[in-house]
Amino acid sequence: MKIIQEIPERNIIKLIPENLDDLWHLSHIIQPYNAIYAVTERRTEDKGDKLRADRGTKRRVFLGIKAEKINFHEDFNRLRVSGKIIHAPDDIPIGSYHTIDIEPFLQVSVQKNWKKWDIERLKEAEDSSKKPKVVVVIMDDSEADIFLVREFGIKELASIKSGVSKKLDYKQNEQAKFSYYSDIINSISEFEGKILFAGPGFGRNNIQNYISEKYKSLAPNVVVESANHTGKSGLSEILKSGIIDKIYGEARISKETQVVEKLLEEISKKGLAAYGIESVNNAMNFSAIDTLLLTDEYLRRNRRSVENLMNSVENINGNIIIVSTEHDAGKQLKALGGISALLRFPIE
């Protein structure tokens, strides 16, 4: 994310999203009734062309709309914001509806009552764009699962079988193994950034040696760590361990996973935790909240009612973490009601 300009007297921030992660952040920053300004395509009636008067022609115009619907489309790499037009050229009626498709590298101006957590989220998105992307390969000698670590969750890129078998002789197994390594490398070679190989056994070390010999330009990006499990269980183990943070410089998804894990640990021992809106509000009455955790879904559905609570947490110097429901930790928090808190001291 690039923050181009801040205009505090008008509550406007001009910015440029640079990738899918930035669009996801924006989908949680832009709320109904916010004003969005951008260059967009609009079909307008061409009164001088009778043949096309029924459809009009598309042209690029600078419009402002008051947001009503905000939809993040991961598969199409865009964020769609729909609402009534509040600023337009003279030939486009104010109050008519329009949808602005926000895509990477489109400059957008957002006008809203900016909260502290909105600004923090923008700054976080700006910082994350400077960090290397991380691909995680959870593997052993028989299978590899490949994942891309994003700000809002994990994307599974591929699942590859080795073809190694006890039924094959040594030479055939060696051929199958090298073919397996080649398939893995072909699946990750287009991604810039760090590549973490993890899993039980020696598969991770063997492929590191193979890359050092055959793909020397890729070798400096390779990191190897042990894990007790394969597949998604192995990925969960890696996220909880903090290894991603060492590579990435604190990945959002790793941070969220670790804080939810801490919450579950406190709940299991009836320690410094509260979950559910009633329990959390009660903790706030005692100024006991150290860290407030909300899922993005909960905040979206209850923003107006929960903003007072968030402001109160900030007033006692508490932390606020908004957790994505696109990964397992977010789903666990959702199962607890979507809102929880880590406490400074126990309360009755």
From Swiss-Prot:
Originating gene: pelA
Organism: Methanococcus maripaludis (strain DSM 14266 / JCM 13030 / NBRC 101832 / S2 / LL)
Gene3D superfamilies xrefs: 3.30.1330.30, eRF1 domain 2, Pelota, domain A
Cofactor names: a divalent metal cation
Name the UniProt record assigns to this protein: Protein pelota homolog
EC number: 3.1.-.-
UniProt xrefs under NCBIfam families: pelota
InterPro entries cross-referenced by the UniProt entry: eFR1_2_sf (IPR042226), eRF1_1_Pelota (IPR005140), eRF1_3 (IPR005142), Pelota/DOM34_N (IPR038069), Pelota_arc (IPR023521), Ribosomal_eL30-like_sf (IPR029064), Transl-rel_pelota (IPR004405)
GO molecular function: endonuclease activity; metal ion binding
GO CC list: cytoplasm
Quaternary structure and partners: Monomer.
